[in-house]
């Protein structure tokens, strides 16, 4: 239940500046314990989980809107569009702009 609650929180707040340390400590857990056990439950670290949610939502926005990549980065929770593009490329194998071109 604890990790389902965390996953739900991350899904609902993926576009905010989520600090794993603050999340864990506000629930009376050490950061290392939370990360280790979240990974056992989900198969991924909390930050990887959040990144995956953000990239999936960015992908949907690229498919369904004409928003600029910089705007999409901001919408899904990244202040730095370059960092967002690198993460997107790492997960999807192409840049956000290339992904959008492939859809046409």
Predicted regions and their residues:
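Short, small-residue-biased leader/transition segments that mark boundaries at the very start
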Residues: 1-2
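Terminal helix-turn-helix DNA-binding modules in bacterial transcription factors
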Residues: 7-8, 12, 16-21, 40-82, ...
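Charge-rich, low-complexity intrinsically disordered segments
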Residues: 23, 29-31, 35
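Core residues of bacterial helix-turn-helix
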Residues: 26-27, 76, 88
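Short linear Ser/Thr-Pro motifs
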Residues: 30-32, 65, 85
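Short hydrophobic/aromatic patch on the recognition helix
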Residues: 34, 38, 83-84, 88
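Short, contiguous hydrophobic alpha-helices characteristic of membrane insertion segments
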Residues: 87-90, 102
